[in-house]
Amino acid sequence: TCALPILLAATISQERLQQQAETAGISAYTRMEQLFILTINELIRQSGQTLEDKTCGLILSTTKGNIDLLTRHTEHPDEAVFLWKMAENIAGYFHAEERVHVISNACISGVSALVTGKRMIENGIYRKVIVAGGDLLSHFITSGFLSFRSLSSRPCRPYDSNRDGLNLGEACGAVLLSTEKTPNSIILSGGAISNDANHISGPSRTGDGLFFAIRQAMQEAGTALQNISFVNAHGTATVYNDEMESKALTLAHLEQVPTHSLKPYFGHTLGASGIIESIVCMHELKQGILFGTPGYETPGVPMPIPVYATHQHIPMKHCVKTASGFGGCNAAIVLSLPEYAPFKDEDNTLPEIRCTREVRIENSSVFINNELIFHSEEPDFGIFI
């Protein structure tokens, strides 16, 4: 392997993890599996909900799982690198082999897992779902982001004019979705997933895909625009992601709602980001504090959005949490304080979906708004797509 340049990243102490794994008797598991098991065990300790309950499902969110095993010589079998094997090992520890599901959908994995868990409960598959998300730093992941020239050697600065890339992080988090309310409950009142099919690694240049996800999530939650207290956006501090998000929020008429990114605090944690950032949003709703976006000084996105570098005390009702990722995927959820149930505001003036681009396929050519953007030499091209 080649040496990587010095970069800023948020890492988990290997020494501390080893100590906790030894105490829990899970040293034989991979590092990723250890983090998942320790995190889920802590959730079980706090909530009292165990996976011995057959009405409780388990969703694991990750982008790469045990991918670090590809570049390390370990005693683990070759199949350990596959997501299904990682899930089998983790679920086996909790005796929940028949109730484990893996969500791996790039950087929206965590938010997608929450939406999936919500739908499973609504469709009567489970009464409760433990949703855990995690990813590790590895040579594979770091070199991949380096190839896109999207990493920064300094603390990331989402939405700032001087942003120059993201910081990676490793983390694991877990939440319990349940039909049973507790005094500390936050309601997952809406959720949606979309895909703009723009590029394998680049976000949409218009923001319409993320806008569709936001609009559908808000429609499901039934909350009016004026009752959204803040937006926790993906905010990676790459040029194109932050530009796209500003356009999407404007399309959704959320351009006046306080917006922030949590990436400067613990980096971009990939499959864990949607989970741990949602946990932070829950605490913000309860405490009435919107965390600042460190490093933000000068607006640097085409559509102005209110971003603050310092913490703000604001009245809380609902928040929108978004994520976007490779392959054009987008996801959004609405988190709500329980006292604002049933979330059906009378003045529900959500923006309507409108056609932003006209796509036409003629012979073997693709036109967008009457402009030729692709031509294939394959005579049956139109049939295949």
What are these regions (language model features)?
Residues 40, 58, 110, 117, ...:
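Conserved small-residue
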Residues 60-62, 132, 233-237:
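Glycine-rich beta-strand-to-loop/alpha-helix junction loops that act as flexible
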Residues 3-34, 65-116, 125, 141-168, ...:
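Conserved catalytic cysteine-centered active-site region
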